[in-house]
């Protein structure tokens, strides 16, 4: 029994004795269950030593699983015990036997799916791929497989919906993967409208074909038997070559990828057409005052795809123009991020710019800055413009008379005379004419001191045959003064005295 009980030890044995036989039950697994499982394996002619490892338990489960449907209760109990022991070996946390069976079923399903996937991949690799127009038949010979109507329908639908927007080019490249020049011409012929664009495309193809003929001149002499002639520009375009010749060039040794060459010419022409159908330059893409940054980025990169430039130039446009053409709010945020910021960081930082929340936050910050500036200016003015006090006793600055240490001055602090105080001093009460105010006699200065005389001329001066003297005949020393004297305003008038 000692050898049979030594299947588990240490921490695994502790985990084994914590597992319950049934969900919610009180009984737990003990060493006696391991001894019983070993004896049962002996009875079924299986090696009890397999219980000492997870791999051995897995082999036992594979042998016992087919007999579960028709087996006795002892076989089911043995299967449950081995399944629980497998989870203990694998350090899988379980609480009871039911959880152990669920874990075993999950592992078996996963292994089954992996096995099926491996078999499927192996089967696919053993067969010739049917995804390309040129496939191999059972004899190993290359055979052309025409484009499906579904592929052509997808291409026509893209042209109808997108016209010649930048995303048409990658769509054409995906649908024409591995196609022959004949297949490419079929795709171009399915385009009913946009004949101006098609004519531009033909011109580009003719130019590239002429350049091909110039760079690849025909070798003099006849073609050797068993060899394929070299393709000309018109052959690559499918004008002067048939399908068999195209397949021969594409599958020859060495191969001449006429389909890929012709496809490259078409994409070059499509780039020119996309440029014509997208007249907006990348320099004209600017973010509106209230436009979200995400919409601005979408328009920017859509215009960037239509630009006829190298990838280095496009990268420079992205790093420079994307920030330069943003609105002031986003531009301030993007410049604060620095030149090394990624597009994700830019979009995250500018998220919500232009909305009501952002406007309220900007307004609050501006108001806070103005308030702080005013407070600092007020504090600065208070510090810079201190009130200068002067002592009336000694005449020095920096203290007042109450705190003055000099001997107390007698008399008036204003004029220095004795007999009166500063508040009664008349030195400071003289008006600008030099007269003391208020006067000790007469009415207050803001009242008229005499009755105003009429200023209109007498009735005799209005006519009745009397001659009005001219101003030139009046004496020069006679000057006109207002009838109301200054006495009415400032007390006594020195001119009237």
From Swiss-Prot:
HIV-1 lineages are divided in three main groups, M (for Major), O (for Outlier), and N (for New, or Non-M, Non-O). The vast majority of strains found worldwide belong to the group M. Group O seems to be endemic to and largely confined to Cameroon and neighboring countries in West Central Africa, where these viruses represent a small minority of HIV-1 strains. The group N is represented by a limited number of isolates from Cameroonian persons. The group M is further subdivided in 9 clades or subtypes (A to D, F to H, J and K). GO terms for molecular function: RNA binding; structural molecule activity; zinc ion binding. Pfam families: Gag_p17, Gag_p24_C, Gag_p6, zf-CCHC. Residues 189-227 are annotated as: Interaction with host PPIA/CYPA and NUP153. Keywords: AIDS, Capsid protein, Host cell membrane, Host cytoplasm, Host endosome, Host membrane, Host nucleus, Host-virus interaction, Lipoprotein, Membrane, Metal-binding, Methylation, Myristate, Phosphoprotein, Repeat, RNA-binding, Viral budding, Viral budding via the host ESCRT complexes, Viral nucleoprotein, Viral release from host cell, Virion, Zinc, Zinc-finger. A motif (PTAP/PSAP motif) lies at residues 454-457. This is Gag polyprotein. Residues 217-225 are annotated as: PPIA/CYPA-binding loop. A zinc finger (CCHC-type) spans 389-406, 410-427. PANTHER family: ENDOGENOUS RETROVIRUS GROUP K MEMBER 24 GAG POLYPROTEIN-RELATED, PTHR40389:SF4. InterPro entries: Gag_p24_C (IPR045345), Gag_p6 (IPR014817), Lentvrl_matrix_N (IPR000071), Matrix_HIV/RSV_N (IPR012344), Primate_lentivir_Gag_pol-like (IPR050195), Retrov_capsid_C (IPR008916), Retrov_capsid_N (IPR008919), Retrovr_matrix (IPR010999). The keyword Metal-binding applies. Late-budding domains (L domains) are short sequence motifs essential for viral particle budding. They recruit proteins of the host ESCRT machinery (Endosomal Sorting Complex Required for Transport) or ESCRT-associated proteins. p6-gag contains two L domains: a PTAP/PSAP motif, which interacts with the UEV domain of TSG101 and a LYPX(n)L motif which interacts with PDCD6IP/AIP1. Transmembrane segments: none annotated. Residues 7-31 are annotated as: Interaction with Gp41. Residues 8-43 are annotated as: Interaction with host CALM1. A motif (Nuclear localization signal) lies at residues 26-32. Residues 277-363 are annotated as: Dimerization/Multimerization of capsid protein p24. A motif (LYPX(n)L motif) lies at residues 480-489. A lipid is attached at residue 2 (N-myristoyl glycine). It comes from the Viruses. GO terms for cellular component: host cell nucleus; host cell plasma membrane; host multivesicular body; membrane; viral nucleocapsid; virion membrane. Residues 14-33 are annotated as: Interaction with membrane phosphatidylinositol 4,5-bisphosphate and RNA. A motif (Nuclear export signal) lies at residues 16-22.
């Amino acid at each position: 029994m000692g050898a049979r009980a030594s299947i588990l030890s240490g921490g695994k044995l502790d985990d084994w004795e914590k597992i319950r036989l049934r969900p919610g039950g009180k009984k737990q697994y003990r060493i006696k269950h391991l001894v019983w499982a070993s004896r049962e394996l002996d009875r079924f002619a299986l090696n009890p030593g397999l219980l000492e490892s997870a791999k051995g338990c897995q082999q036992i489960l594979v042998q016992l699983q087919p007999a579960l449907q028709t087996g006795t209760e002892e076989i089911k109990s043995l299967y449950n015990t081995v399944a629980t022991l497998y989870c203990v070996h694998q350090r899988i946390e379980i609480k009871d036997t039911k959880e152990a069976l669920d874990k075993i079923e999950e592992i078996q399903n996963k292994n089954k799916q992996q096995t099926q996937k491996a078999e499927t991949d192996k089967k696919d690799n053993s067969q010739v791929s049917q995804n390309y127009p040129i496939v191999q038949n059972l004899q190993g010979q290359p055979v052309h497989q025409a484009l499906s109507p579904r592929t052509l329908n997808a291409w026509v639908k893209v042209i109808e919906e997108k016209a010649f927007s930048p995303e048409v080019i990658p769509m054409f490249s995906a649908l024409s993967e591995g196609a022959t020049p004949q297949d490419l011409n079929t795709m171009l012929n399915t385009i009913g409208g946009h004949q101006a664009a098609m004519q531009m495309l033909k011109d580009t193809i003719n130019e590239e074909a002429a350049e091909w003929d110039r760079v690849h001149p025909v070798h003099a002499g006849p073609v050797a038997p068993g060899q394929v002639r070299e393709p000309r520009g018109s052959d690559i375009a499918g004008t002067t070559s048939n399908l068999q010749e195209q397949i021969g060039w594409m599958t020859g040794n060495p191969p001449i990828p006429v389909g890929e060459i012709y496809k490259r010419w078409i994409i070059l022409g499509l780039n020119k057409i996309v440029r014509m159908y997208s007249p907006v330059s990348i320099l004209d893409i600017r973010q509106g005052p209230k436009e979200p940054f995400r919409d601005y980025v979408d328009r920017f990169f859509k215009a960037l795809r239509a630009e006829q430039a190298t990838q280095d130039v496009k990268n420079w446009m992205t790093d420079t123009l994307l920030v330069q053409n943003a609105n002031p709010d986003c531009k301030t945020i993007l410049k604060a991020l620095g030149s090394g910021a990624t597009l994700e960081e830019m979009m995250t930082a500018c998220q919500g710019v232009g909305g009501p929340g952002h406007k309220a936050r900007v307004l609050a910050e501006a108001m806070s800055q103005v308030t702080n500036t005013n407070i600092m200016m007020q504090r600065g003015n208070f510090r810079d413009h201190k009130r200068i006090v002067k002592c009336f006793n000694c005449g020095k600055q920096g203290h007042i008379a109450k705190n003055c240490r000099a001997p107390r001055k007698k008399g008036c602090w204003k004029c220095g005379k004795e007999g009166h105080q500063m508040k009664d001093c008349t030195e400071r009460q003289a008006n600008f004419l030099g007269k003391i105010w208020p006067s000790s006699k007469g009415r207050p200065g803001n009242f008229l001191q005499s009755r105003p005389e009429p200023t209109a001329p007498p009735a005799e001066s209005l006519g009745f045959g009397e001659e009005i003297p001219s101003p030139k005949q009046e004496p020069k020393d006679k000057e006109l003064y207002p009838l109301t004297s200054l006495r009415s305003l400032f007390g006594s008038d020195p001119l009237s005295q």
